């Protein structure tokens, strides 16, 4: 069946035919048949160099043979036991050894679960109710994350989705990423009531928005001053740029860290962790409840350990050089066409904005989304797949070769010409 035919069937089964909103785009999404290395093949026979990579987990590329082998071997032993297995210890030990601020952790099934439980834990430890999150920051699809700014910069947030009670929104204050004065004012007004600040160290769900020099250090200082906790959401950034969390590269010590994506090797996973003192509050050693039927399940643990074991032997500098080559090439193409743009990138992740600067969420909102979507459609026709949304992130994997980068730049040349 073709993608169009499959979508017509899917539209009768799922809202708008998809199981996650970002997968839908006009006129209909293509349906993937298989992925190998840096590429995906759709049911219509079209092959794409993939920079979406499952929205981030596949840093080793599609169908990595070592990860695939580990999954098959585990499947033959059992899919789920409801009891502990050795691989969860092996994966946790590897994460603990390479993460300065994680002495103890709890595996979950997604980044959404991880941040939800991290927020509950912070509230329990501090005895406080309020959470500060950043405008445009995404921490999963739970009620405490889906909050946007209220009518004023120092007011409580408002629900960004129907179904979230106003009472929930009244426990979340939305701050401005990269705006120290705004965060200072929030703490001056609510400081002794704030349980935690949660932020992505690099905002990856608003495109790619980098922290200004000193901003993350400022968050660490002001939370410590007021007895609040600092939560770094490293679901995207963890093990993305080196075999460590991003916080270790920046030498910043949050109280609680959440991770996901890469550490699962392509299978569902999440994690929240911190010092032993903090994590001992989680049940059954403490009274902060957290549980999950599939948490630490043997399939995800096997895939995660195999992926992390292989990743520990990789040279990240090669990956960064390829990303830089790609970004520089795209920048040159758009410059020669006199198209106003900026490319935000760090290490192995990047996004193209059609605006002259993007330093915060407000800037990202002003970028010309319609031009980005034209680029997305034109690139798809030329065999390159970027996320369809301006506010997602592109990733380069260890499976991407120099020839992939060259082919991508050639496709960009054609795509930009077709956009005229």
Swiss-Prot record:
Highest classification ranks of the organism: Archaea, Methanobacteriati, Thermoplasmatota, Thermoplasmata, Thermoplasmatales
Organism annotation: Thermoplasma volcanium (strain ATCC 51530 / DSM 4299 / JCM 9571 / NBRC 15438 / GSS1)
Reported cofactor(s): pyridoxal 5'-phosphate
Gene name of the record: hemL
A GO CC term attached to the entry: cytoplasm
InterPro entries named among the record's database cross-references: 4pyrrol_synth_GluAld_NH2Trfase (IPR004639), Aminotrans_3 (IPR005814), Aminotrans_3_PPA_site (IPR049704), PyrdxlP-dep_Trfase (IPR015424), PyrdxlP-dep_Trfase_major (IPR015421), PyrdxlP-dep_Trfase_small (IPR015422)
One Pfam family it belongs to: Aminotran_3
Keyword list, A-Z: Cytoplasm, Isomerase, Porphyrin biosynthesis, Pyridoxal phosphate
The reaction(s) this protein catalyses: (S)-4-amino-5-oxopentanoate = 5-aminolevulinate
Main location: cytoplasm
Record family assignment: Belongs to the class-III pyridoxal-phosphate-dependent aminotransferase family. HemL subfamily.
Pathway: Porphyrin-containing compound metabolism; protoporphyrin-IX biosynthesis; 5-aminolevulinate from L-glutamyl-tRNA(Glu): step 2/2
Protein name: Glutamate-1-semialdehyde 2,1-aminomutase
